[in-house]
Amino acid sequence: MIKLSEKGVFLASNNEIIAEEHFTGEIKKEEAKKGTIAWSILSSHNTSGNMDKLKIKFDSLASHDITFVGIVQTAKASGMERFPLPYVLTNCHNSLCAVGGTINGDDHVFGLSAAQRYGGIFVPPHIAVIHQYMREMMAGGGKMILGSDSHTRYGALGTMAVGEGGGELVKQLLNDTWDIDYPGVVAVHLTGKPAPYVGPQDVALAIIGAVFKNGYVKNKVMEFVGPGVSALSTDFRNSVDVMTTETTCLSSVWQTDEEVHNWLALHGRGQDYCQLNPQPMAYYDGCISVDLSAIKPMIALPFHPSNVYEIDTLNQNLTDILREIEIESERVAHGKAKLSLLDKVENGRLKVQQGIIAGCSGGNYENVIAAANALRGQSCGNDTFSLAVYPSSQPVFMDLAKKGVVADLIGAGAIIRTAFCGPCFGAGDTPINNGLSIRHTTRNFPNREGSKPANGQMSAVALMDARSIAATAANGGYLTSASELDCWDNVPEYAFDVTPYKNRVYQGFVKGATQQPLIYGPNIKDWPELGALTDNIVLKVCSKILDEVTTTDELIPSGETSSYRSNPIGLAEFTLSRRDPGYVSRSKATAELENQRLAGNVSELTEVFARIKQIAGQEHIDPLQTEIGSMVYAVKPGDGSAREQAASCQRVIGGLANIAEEYATKRYRSNVINWGMLPLQMAEVPTFEVGDYIYIPGIKAALDNPGTTFKGYVIHEDAPVTEITLYMESLTAEEREIIKAGSLINFNKNRQM
């Protein structure tokens, strides 16, 4: 079904894959690297003149309503006067959260006023989810788009799209660049044709299951090529493509064909089509060979999209597999709540409590059509099981309504909702306690569906394709593979109508900036002042997390908490609240120590500094010139969302560093850097504990020599001082200065002086 090459490969024009060690052609590997689609797009957007060290200018930007407020505030504080490139502000994340009174609506009005003031594009609530709007109206062949959402992926249309934290978008708004080393490029070589009952989520989950745990494509570009591409509709490709984020890849791109041309022309943008193919001989750093005809209906069980099984395999081994998930749930809940699954097995079938088809992965036209085909004339039943369907945009919704598909779904008992990303991150349709929800959405991290373990609640999500979800719904909630039905061939041609966008979307980039005032609600606050880095620092260990991976959902919860993202200090109260509830108070206490230092008082750390002065070479350290900050240790932090708040929330309550064995994603590490924190790493198992201090002398010099090791000294409460070895991976010159300045905002202010 899926095979991974052990080394690099050459791809010939006849689709022959040649292992690097067996290649005998004349072209050199370095020259053949230029034959990938990724090279052609990156080179056309690179401004550095050096393809090893890229400085990328994007064609457009995209943000939604739980990220754009902070981005605009940061850019404004950094001197921005107008949006220099098309910037789309959508309102698809907190648009249904009944949290905090007016705060969500206030964010939306702020977004509209920002689009009017600076010349942006504003998509009101319920009109479209961010990535469907970008597909329909912005993406095209050979383009690059940067979004403040990790699922920013438009590769099937020939666009290399990247999800990053808000700081990287701010740089583009200030006419700066996205700076990275040239990434590895991995071919995803598709052959065959999927069975009619196999959908895009099945293909995506199979790939994720094969590459996530071994890091095969981490921070690399996935380039989809091969004869199997032409067997897939553009809708199908889009739904596979958006899930590549869950592999931890950097970006994605597909070869394009007349099918893509027709799709863009249908949306009134045929001129944005560009035929993209690898050169006759192209070199890839790896190859994922996918036989589409061998893919079966899949399920990703809690608590990660990589926890993948064939549905048939699960149904044949329910007891063993479900017990493994129950054991994992006990670890995830830390004894605060319980999830039981074996009690949901009735007569040898797993009974689920909810089905959801939504968002940029599930809510697309063909997925909803498939669900309707399975449910036409059927019933979801009148027990606990329920089904909700969220079309991904109003144009999609409108065509489904015109074709009678909405009526078919409603008649079967499904609930039809507007374009909303809530089920993807816990802001809508939270299941019942101890419930299992099957969803065609993007993620199934712990508690991302909205449950609150601190309140004794635990529910979970399994990811599936819309086809198998609909088959399950037609079977009253008993887990059913789409292969058990034969109803998948009737897919009427989609008719796109731009009228909802013409009537509701504010096109400020065309109209230009008006310089009218921004409209602030009472919850929208400016970023607090942050201090610059000193030569020597003291870190207090405020959290130590030894889980294999720490997600951004654990660092700062999603769901209703997201509504507070316009208030940096208010949101920070929720930092690590589900994983380490004592962290916030410990970090705030450390921040108070720093405030006292700035006021000339370090008396509370007299003993700590006395022990530091006993370290050879540190006898003359000045405590008043030594910054004090909190630190989080995690083995592998940052899997998941691009949200900059995963880092900023630590920073605004005293955070000064992370220490990790490795960082799960480039985007989280960038967020740490842009918020003025040190992205420290250590190979050894940490011996420090929460409450210990770590003294690091000469940290500015260490910043100027990334990749080299340097010493830290652990000040234990009741033990001798011990040495640890730290390092930082590659940092650009600008990133080093951002950390020294204390934040991206400070760095930009310094440049204006």
Swiss-Prot record:
Residues that coordinate or bind [4Fe-4S] cluster: C360, C421, C424
Assigned protein family: Belongs to the aconitase/IPM isomerase family.
This protein's record includes keyword Transferase: no
Cofactor binding, note field: Binds 1 [4Fe-4S] cluster per subunit.
GO terms under biological process: response to oxidative stress; tricarboxylic acid cycle
GO CC annotations, alphabetized: cytosol
InterPro entries registered for this protein in UniProt: Acnase/IPM_dHydase_lsu_aba_1/3, Acoase/IPM_deHydtase_lsu_aba, Aconitase/3IPM_dehydase_swvl, Aconitase/IPM_isomerase, Aconitase_4Fe-4S_dom, Aconitase_dom2, AconitaseA/IPMdHydase_ssu_swvl
UniProt superkingdom: Bacteria
Keywords, alphabetical: Iron, Iron-sulfur, Metal-binding
Designated gene of the protein: ybhJ
One term of GO molecular function: 4 iron, 4 sulfur cluster binding
Cofactor requirements of the protein: [4Fe-4S] cluster
Pfam families: Aconitase, Aconitase_C
Protein name: Uncharacterized protein YbhJ
